[in-house]
């Protein structure tokens, strides 16, 4: 087992990081307290509409003009 311990590529990688003085980054700490009130139904509906409109509008445009795209 001692030979295996010295040949582990992950261990060599961490040794290289230590030689460079790099440390793994700390996890992100939230900058503020959590939201105190839950989202209302209207806020959630607006968010979903904006989200789906953002992604589905370009797809609908491409599918609607597919014949033009095929000609080029």
Curated annotation (Swiss-Prot):
Tissue specificity remark: It is not yet known where COX8C is expressed.
Pathway field: Energy metabolism; oxidative phosphorylation
TM helices/strands, residue ranges: 41-64
Localization terms from the record: Mitochondrion inner membrane
GO cellular component: mitochondrial inner membrane; mitochondrion; respiratory chain complex IV
One of the GO biological process terms: mitochondrial electron transport, cytochrome c to oxygen
Bilayer disposition of the protein: Single-pass membrane protein
Mitochondrial intermembrane side: 65-72
Transit peptide interval: 1-29
Keyword field contains Nucleotide-binding: no
Pfam annotation, one family: COX8
InterPro entries the UniProt entry points to: Cyt_c_oxidase_su8, Cyt_c_oxidase_su8_sf
Keywords for this protein: Membrane, Mitochondrion, Mitochondrion inner membrane, Transit peptide, Transmembrane, Transmembrane helix
Mitochondrial matrix side: 30-40
Family from the record: Belongs to the cytochrome c oxidase VIII family.
Function recorded in the entry: Component of the cytochrome c oxidase, the last enzyme in the mitochondrial electron transport chain which drives oxidative phosphorylation. The respiratory chain contains 3 multisubunit complexes succinate dehydrogenase (complex II, CII), ubiquinol-cytochrome c oxidoreductase (cytochrome b-c1 complex, complex III, CIII) and cytochrome c oxidase (complex IV, CIV), that cooperate to transfer electrons derived from NADH and succinate to molecular oxygen, creating an electrochemical gradient over the inner membrane that drives transmembrane transport and the ATP synthase.
Quaternary structure and interacting proteins, as annotated: Component of the cytochrome c oxidase (complex IV, CIV), a multisubunit enzyme composed of 14 subunits. The complex is composed of a catalytic core of 3 subunits MT-CO1, MT-CO2 and MT-CO3, encoded in the mitochondrial DNA, and 11 supernumerary subunits COX4I1 (or COX4I2), COX5A, COX5B, COX6A1 (or COX6A2), COX6B1 (or COX6B2), COX6C, COX7A2 (or COX7A1), COX7B, COX7C, COX8A and NDUFA4, which are encoded in the nuclear genome.
Protein name, UniProt field: Cytochrome c oxidase subunit 8C, mitochondrial
Organism: Homo sapiens (Human)
Organism taxonomic ancestry: Eukaryota, Metazoa, Chordata, Craniata, Vertebrata
